[in-house]
UniProtKB/Swiss-Prot annotation:
Protein name, as recorded: Chaperonin GroEL
Localization terms from the record: Cytoplasm
Function: Together with its co-chaperonin GroES, plays an essential role in assisting protein folding. The GroEL-GroES system forms a nano-cage that allows encapsulation of the non-native substrate proteins and provides a physical environment optimized to promote and accelerate protein folding.
Top EC class for this record: isomerase
Organism for this UniProt entry: Burkholderia cepacia
Catalytic activity: ATP + H2O + a folded polypeptide = ADP + phosphate + an unfolded polypeptide
Keywords from the named record: ATP-binding, Chaperone, Cytoplasm, Isomerase, Nucleotide-binding
Length: 546
């Protein structure tokens, strides 16, 4: 095991604070509408230009081990805030830096770090309650667009795209972001449930122009096993033919004689059918078949439920208004399932999301909720160059997370104003002793820091603006984009409550840990091994002359 360097007290803390400051100073220049860009070097390809706080934070690794510890702790603030709320990473970093900076002064003057932390925690809890009180719900398209625009660094076109997508697929719908092929942003919406399996034979196509099979008002047969024997299918096919409606078969696979017979019937116009494989694999396949059954008001023909293909009746088949089957995708539009059953299924899947441990599982479950609840929208980001595309895509993703957070917990005035207003809840607080009161004071000072930084990045005098905003009431604040004092909500400068709350809580949590640190253990830098000796010189007089 390598030897370690153990550093105590002020020496450890001051080194870690240096690391905090290096990281925070690099991140905070991106804050606000007039924030600057940061250029990140890449080991291959061109550099990346970004205004995203967490992207900058993730790139920073410092040579000095103790400085790096401090930087990594603040990096944790940014990434945790990004994971929970999807935005607010720069605000969280600015808050953490301020709490650490002010707190260190008090620790150096001999105050008890534990009491300081208790005071900080008390103040943050009161501020969070106040933020929840002043929060207002975010329901209209206009408000959603405003949140998206602010989060995408005041790019209103991105906000409008996200609001349009949410309007089309609902608040629960899945919205994904992809690279576009043109200069303009595009929005593709898939209504109904879509899964990534296409027709098993091109002979099922009945719309040659679009190369798809379209079934109007069809029955849907769901089976969890392979179908290879046509005899198993005959009874149900006869019932469907009598009803004079088309049929979609979703099974593990349809092959051999069964597939050939379906194709022949289709070509001759006796019975319009399409066969597709069931989506997903293993347990996920069973769950998705069950989802389709609930959406279409049918049942999965499976041994577990005591149903067999030979005895299947029309009552066990699902129904839909329209189904489109392409080469790679199947879309079920307007399934005949009961709203109450679908709602119950959505609740059940949501409960599984809460318990999911891996990001992959959570993502797949969220997709299932969206497919049951309404649809999928894809925002295709357009840009002139690849570098711009990457930067813009990151902003769209940020904005998307922020709008979700806004719909979830509501919105507050943006531009650092909400934190200034939440200070009123802390102003009257007192701790159990003078050290706790100092902790409360630290948070009071830190909560004006985001506004200070926004103003500084805009090239104005921070103290004057902070005093003017603090003297105002409600949503009165400073719009750094225009340099005017306005009602922030009316001007469309709003932040999701969840983002502001999460930033403050995470910043206080990590800053409190730093303040209460009294020793740091780091690996000693490896000493370079001395150069190996050269070859000895030859001895004189050893020539080989004969």
């Amino acid at each position: 095991m390598a030897a370690k360097d153990v550093v105590f007290g002020d020496s450890a803390r001051s080194k870690m604070v240096e690391g905090v400051n290096i990281l925070a100073n690099a991140v905070k220049v991106t804050l606000g509408p007039k924030g600057r860009n940061v250029v990140l070097e890449r080991s291959f390809g061109g550099p990346t230009v970004t205004k995203d706080g967490v992207s900058v934070a993730k790139e920073i690794e410092l040579k000095d081990k103790l400085q790096n510890m401090g930087a990594q702790m603040v990096k944790e603030v940014a990434s945790k805030t990004s994971d929970n709320a999807g935005d607010g990473t720069t605000t969280a970093t600015v808050l953490a830096q301020s709490i650490v900076r002010e707190g260190m002064k008090y620790v150096a003057s001999g105050m008890n770090p534990m009491d300081l932390k208790r005071g900080i925690d008390k103040a943050v809890a009161a501020a969070v309650e106040e933020l929840k009180k002043i929060s207002k719900p975010c329901t209209t398209n206009k408000e959603i667009a405003q949140v998206g625009s602010i989060s995408a660094n005041s790019d209103s076109s991105i906000g409008d795209r996200i609001a349009e997508a949410m309007d089309k697929v609902g608040k629960e719908g899945v919205i994904t972001v992809e690279d576009g092929k043109s200069l303009a942003d595009e929005l593709d919406v898939v209504e109904g449930m879509q899964f990534d399996r296409g027709y098993l034979s091109p002979y099922f196509i009945n719309n040659p122009d679009k190369q798809v099979a379209v079934l109007d008002n069809p029955f849907v047969l769901l089976h969890d096993k392979k179908v290879s024997n046509i005899r198993d299918l005959l009874p149900v096919l006869e019932q469907v033919a009598k009803a004079g409606r088309p049929l979609l078969i979703i099974a593990e696979d349809v092959e051999g004689e069964a597939l050939a017979t379906l194709v022949v019937n289709n070509i001759r116009g006796i019975l319009k059918t399409v066969a597709v494989k069931a989506p997903g694999f293993g347990d996920r396949r069973k769950a998705m078949l069950e989802d389709i059954a609930i959406l279409t008001g049918g049942q999965v023909i499976a041994e577990e439920t005591g149903l067999t293909l030979e005895k299947a009746t029309l009552a066990e088949l699902g129904q839909a208004k329209r189904i489109e089957v392409g080469k790679e995708n199947t879309t079920i539009i307007d399934g005949a399932g009961e709203a109450a059953s679908i709602e119950a299924r959505v609740k059940q899947v949501r409960a599984q999301i809460e318990e999911a441990t891996s990001d992959y599982d959570r993502e797949k479950l969220q997709e299932r909720v969206a497919k049951l609840a309404g649809g999928v929208a894809v925002i295709k980001v357009g840009a002139a160059t690849e570098v711009e595309m990457k930067e813009k895509k990151a902003r769209v993703e940020d904005a998307l997370h922020a709008t979700r957070a806004a719909v979830e917990e509501g919105i507050v005035a943006g531009g650092g104003v909400a934190l200034i207003r939440a200070r009123t809840a802390i102003a009257g607080l007192t701790g159990a002793n003078a050290d706790q009161n100092a902790g409360i004071k630290i948070v009071l000072r830190a909560m004006e820091e985001p506004l200070r930084q926004i103003v500084t990045n805009g090239g104005e005098e921070a103290s004057v603006v902070v005093a003017a905003v603090a003297a105002g009431k409600g949503n009165y604040g400073y719009n750094a984009a225009t340099g005017e004092y306005v009602d922030m909500v009316e001007a469309g400068v709003v932040d999701p409550t969840k983002v502001t709350r999460t930033a403050l809580q995470n910043a206080a949590s990590v800053a409190g840990l730093l303040l209460t640190t009294d020793a740091a253990v780091a690996e000693l830098p490896k000493e370079d091994a001395p150069m190996p000796g050269g070859m000895p010189g030859g001895m004189g007089g050893m020539g080989m002359d004969m």
